[in-house]
């Protein structure tokens, strides 16, 4: 009714609901908020198949949707794990096993890159500062995202 998108935030180990992130357009800017008092550490949103051969971690919901679109285009059996923040991405990636990759945000502050490096996993990001996978998708198309995913998934951990 008020145009809010509600994104469930579930604990990465047992899928218990920890809270909700609300996303809405306010004055032509996207506003993201978590419900007061909720625990964000370990919170994720999984997008894609339940049983996947590969896992791609990212920070934001829109970023995750763009990565999932590219993965489906590539016909990869992979799940996207949206971690909601760079700090939480490090925590969650360290607590999961299997073939894992990171699509980092290319922040001016280098926060996304530092988080990707801290995981020790193969990672990629847009070469344009200030962009995440969703920005890259909007600017250059889904194939630009797919190209980076293909390159990083061929990397040795």
Name the predicted role of every residue range.
Residues 1-55, 66-69, 73-74, 123:
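Basic, glycine-enriched DNA-binding surface that flanks or lies within the catalytic cores of DNA
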Residues 50-56, 61, 65-157:
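TOPRIM fold recognition
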């Amino acid at each position: 009714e008020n145009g809010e998108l509600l994104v469930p935030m579930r604990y990465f180990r047992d899928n218990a609901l920890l809270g909700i992130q609300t996303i809405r357009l306010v004055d032509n800017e996207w506003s993201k908020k978590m419900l007061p008092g909720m625990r964000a550490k370990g919170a994720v949103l999984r997008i894609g198949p339940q049983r996947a051969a590969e896992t791609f971690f990212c920070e934001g919901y829109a970023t995750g949707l763009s990565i999932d679109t590219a993965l489906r285009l590539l016909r990869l059996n992979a799940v996207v794990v949206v971690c909601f923040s760079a700090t939480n991405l490090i925590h969650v990636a360290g607590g999961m096993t299997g073939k894992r990759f990171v699509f980092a945000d290319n922040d001016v502050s280098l926060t996304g890159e530092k988080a990707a490096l801290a995981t020790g996993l193969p990672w990629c990001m847009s070469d344009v500062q200030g962009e995440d996978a969703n920005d890259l998708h909007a600017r250059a198309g889904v194939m630009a995202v797919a190209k980076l995913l293909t390159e990083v998934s061929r990397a040795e951990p």
